[in-house]
Amino acid sequence: MHVIYGGTFDPIHHGHLRLALEVSEALEVSRVHLVPSHIPPHRGSTGASSAQRLEMIRQAIAGEPALALDEQEVHRGGASYTADTLRQLRAELGPDCPLVMVVGTDAFSSFDRWREWQEIPGLAHIVVVRRPGSELPVGSEAAQLVAERCVGSASELHSRPAGLVLELAPPLLDISATGIRRRIAAGRSPRYLTPDDVCQSIRAWGLYGARPVEGQ
């Protein structure tokens, strides 16, 4: 089974990393692939370049065999759309390999506004991570999809290539990339919110309003 977890990762932090590991354990897979978007279609420009975000992810997952970096959206260029990414992966994996995309309830609540959203269940399973205080709108397309396709165990995702929904409620760290960027802009340290190597890169590159390290 091939599992992807997409996002801007601007910057990647311990909340992302812990969630990815929780998913790998819950789904009983050896690896979760982090897929940073190039230009997110539903957000403004990010604070770090695509190349910088890729490098920070490499630093963050170094030495962790359960996490891998998938650079396809960055290399493809342009706006990053989930349906395009899943089609590319389906072509690479073949028709029979179970493919899973991981998404939080906050992002999934607007599922019917995603480009070609109707095609996604035919390409992959969807794992919806329940976040505290974030519920799917009653009567929404997302809620209906969950009601129609939700299964009770991860083992069912292994039995077919696509089309099912699984809800997970793992313990989540209350860390956000937005909060980290604001903290840095205010002159506060992001240490212990994101890996030390990532903190060092943020300072070295002067990202998010950080004061660059002299001589770099």
Curated annotation (Swiss-Prot):
GO terms for molecular function: ATP binding; nicotinate-nucleotide adenylyltransferase activity. It catalyses: nicotinate beta-D-ribonucleotide + ATP + H(+) = deamido-NAD(+) + diphosphate. Belongs to the NadD family. Keywords: ATP-binding, NAD, Nucleotide-binding, Nucleotidyltransferase, Pyridine nucleotide biosynthesis, Transferase. Signal peptide: none annotated. GO terms for biological process: NAD biosynthetic process. HAMAP family: NaMN_adenylyltr (MF_00244). The keyword Disulfide bond does not apply. Catalyzes the reversible adenylation of nicotinate mononucleotide (NaMN) to nicotinic acid adenine dinucleotide (NaAD). Its EC number is 2.7.7.18. It holds the Pfam family CTP_transf_like. This is Probable nicotinate-nucleotide adenylyltransferase. It comes from Marinobacter nauticus (strain ATCC 700491 / DSM 11845 / VT8). Pathway: Cofactor biosynthesis; NAD(+) biosynthesis; deamido-NAD(+) from nicotinate D-ribonucleotide: step 1/1.
